[in-house]
A protein has these predicted regions:
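Iron-sulfur cluster-binding cysteine motifs and their immediate structural context
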Residues: 2-9, 14-39, 43, 47-63, ...
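Iron-sulfur-associated redox domains of electron-transfer enzymes in respiratory
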Residues: 60-347
Length: 347
């Protein structure tokens, strides 16, 4: 049976009940004195992997499969989540890309490119929509939570692919459909998303995976001298690089021709109350919610590397954005990002 993105290693479980107490959706049960994940209830937020004192809650490896893809396909691009700027802060862009290319990747592209197209399409969608509450599809944990635990709000999720999937579609359109795309970021739930869209993203790995991979291959990014080709392809992202911080999506949502009330909230503990309380305003306004499961945004994802404060991480993201103006972007109007979300049948 295929492993889910998060699973239990029974031999390591000491029956301490910490994950049972900490799980925000009560998706863990005890069997034979071991704590197992209830797959039908899990939203893959990764909190259990952070609180387990013995490492019994494991994150599924993606590096082994990625190696096979690199060995068998000539063109493989790494889609790098925008929080890289606060996770590898001691490296230049060129050094990080050079290190990734040493692993065998053809090139490195910013997931934020996909985020920018998502923002544009969401803006258009909101302009044409009736008053109501609309929720971003960018965070896969939030999407899973709503589909399982707030099913009546599933129709409120904007019917757009996430930035990761949008980016993969852009890359395949630009370089050809035979291109293979691997994603790297701080989010465990992206592994689930990749499982559901295998035609777009082959594998999702974490920043921890990437760092460990460098170490195993004896690659020291900080010692590398970048070559001329060690830059982001096919172009560098602009405003999309703000996506990993709370509120980072909102600047890209156009509310000029039609008034859109834009708000951002993070932390799962807030999500349910936010949605429920704003229901009372759905007849009056067009309300767009950027909801992120991790406190402070993706910069605080469960598979993050850096333990730096959220304030410093946010600062680093904003500094990176300020240092890199908008690129000239080709017309992407022909790329379809629409999708549908259905509530799970949890009966």
């Amino acid at each position: 049976m295929d492993l889910k993105p998060i699973y239990t290693e029974p031999e390591n479980c000491q029956d301490c009940y910490k994950c049972v107490r900490e799980c925000p959706v009560k998706a863990i049960q005890i069997e034979d004195n071991k704590a197992y994940i209830i797959e039908e209830r899990c939203i893959y937020c990764g909190h259990c992997t952070q609180v387990c004192p013995t490492g019994a809650k494991k994150i599924r490896d993606g590096v082994s499969r990625t190696r096979l893809i690199l060995q068998n396909y000539p063109r493989v691009i790494l889609s790098l989540a925008p929080s890289w700027a606060c996770e590898f802060e001691d490296l230049s862009i060129g050094q990080l890309i050079a290190a990734i290319r040493k692993l065998g990747f053809s090139g490195v592209s910013e997931t934020a490119i996909g985020a920018e197209l998502v923002s544009s399409r969401v803006s258009d969608y909101l302009q044409q929509s009736q008053p109501g509450v609309y929720i971003s599809s960018a965070c896969p944990v939030v999407v899973e939570y709503i589909r399982k635990y707030s099913a009546e709000h599933t129709p409120a999720i904007t019917p757009m692919l996430s930035p990761m999937l949008a980016h993969a579609r852009i890359l395949k359109d630009y370089y050809g459909n035979d291109l293979k795309v691997i994603f790297a970021g701080p989010c465990i739930c992206k592994k689930l998303e990749a499982d559901h869209f295998k035609e777009l993203v082959e594998v999702a790995i974490t920043f921890k995976d990437l760092k460990n991979w460098f170490e195993k291959e004896n690659i020291h990014p900080e010692q590398l001298t970048p070559a001329a080709e060690d830059h982001f392809i096919p172009w560098q992202a602009g405003i999309g690089s703000l996506y990993p911080v709370e509120g980072g999506m909102l600047p890209g949502i156009d509310g000029e021709s039609k008034k859109i009330v834009k708000m951002a909230f993070s932390d799962l503990s807030n999500i349910k109350d936010v949605i429920k309380n704003l229901d009372t305003r759905r007849e009056k306004d067009t309300i767009f919610l950027e909801l992120l499961a991790c406190k402070g945004g993706c910069i605080n994802g469960p598979a993050k590397l850096s333990q730096t404060s959220l304030a410093i991480k946010r600062y680093n993201i904003q500094q990176h954005r300020a240092a890199h103006p908008e690129s000239t972007v080709p017309d992407l109007g022909h790329i379809d990002l629409t999708t549908t979300f259905k509530a799970y049948d949890c009966s």
